[in-house]
Amino acid sequence: MKVTYHGHSVVKIETNGKTIFIDPFITGNGATDLKLEDVKADVILLTHGHGDHVGDTVQLAKKNNALVIAPFELATYLGWQGVNTHPMHIGGAHQFDFGKVKLTQAFHGSGYVTEDKQIIYLGMPAGILFTAEGKTIYHAGDTGLFSDMKLIGERNSIDVAFLPIGDNFTMGPEDAAVAAEWLRAKIVVPIHYNTFPVIAQDPHQFVALLPDGVGRVLKPGEGIEL
């Protein structure tokens, strides 16, 4: 399995012959190394309905005939746009042919802002536990620190955790360091920072808060082989 960071909260997983994207925000994402026309996706996993996470999902899904896995309300909304979806909800897991997906809690919002200045409610935000080839990845989505991260860490052997550190909209570095301790992940990668001025952070300062060897700053396009 190979896991690659592509800026902001975009993560690509390559496993079992499939290419899986989490939160493919590419157009308008100054932090990514990707070009939309070059992206191939078999599966798209979404944590919540904000534009900087749904991103280019509809276009990518239609172009690649990709399956979109998302919380129920968000999946329903995307299904109305002609996207092939699999709805899930927090606490639920499903075994697909490419791996197992389970949604966890996240403390955030999930409204989509339309061009005519309407906000569409798209259910609860989520984190994602993805397991394949005997490895488990946790993508926290956008979230503040919450105590059930201890439970997630106790019940799952997490190989890589992607945690937001940008503050303002999500955890900042200090809270994310506590999350890393509770989750017990072997590797922790900071995400959701420096895309916009309001979430400017130094990821190396975050890594310095973690035990030696745990934190890993990935530049867009850099990956980890598991």
Swiss-Prot record:
Superkingdom assignment: Bacteria
Key word Hydrolase present: yes
Pfam family, one: Lactamase_B_3
InterPro entries: Metallo-B-lactamas, RibonucZ/Hydroxyglut_hydro, UPF0173, UPF0173_UPF0282_UlaG_hydrolase
Gene Ontology molecular-function annotations: hydrolase activity
Keyword annotations: Hydrolase
Family: Belongs to the UPF0173 family.
Protein's recorded name: UPF0173 metal-dependent hydrolase GWCH70_2696
